[in-house]
C-alpha cells in the first residue's frame, strides 16, 4: 500500500502560517501608534517627550507651560495647529524653559507647526537632523538661540519672527553663544521663506559647519553684534 506524501501540504501550511504571523505583526505595529490631543492649559513641570510611536496634536489657543530647564521633545510626530487669532503659546512655569526640540528620529514623520509663540525660553526651537514644516513661528527674547539647527536639519520655515534675545544674560553668560536669532550648523540645509529678526545681542543669522540652505526675504535689524556671520 502506498503511503500518501503530505510534505507539500505541510510546507504550504507553514508558509501560510508565517504570512499570517507577519501580517498580524504589521497590523499590531500600526495599531500601536497613539494620538494625544492637548487643549486649554497644559502644565509640564518636567517637560514632555513625544515618543516615536506617538502623534501629539495641539489645538488652537492652547497654552503649554514648561518647567525651568525642560523642553517639549519630539521623537515621533507633532502637529501644532495654532491660528492667527488663537496661537499656541509655549511659556515657562518659572525661570526659562528650553523650547521645542525635534530629535533625529522625528525626521520624515510629517511634523507641522503653525502659529506657535515661544516666550520665556533659553532656546526657542531646536532641530536635530529633522524636517518639520514650520510656519508663522514667533520667538520672543530667547536667551541663547531662537531657532537652532544641527546635524543636517532640513526644515521648511515660512514667516519667522524673532524679537529680542540675549538681553537678560548679557554680561553674565559664560559662553559667546547667546542672543542669536537663526543658527544654521553642522550640514543643515533649511529653506527659509520670510523672516523678521530684530533686537538681538550677538547675531541675527549664524551660518557654520558646512551648512547650506535657501534663505529669502529676510529683514534683520537692531543687532548689537554681527547681522550675519558665515
Q: Model segments located where?
A:
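Secretory targeting signatures
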Residues: 1-29
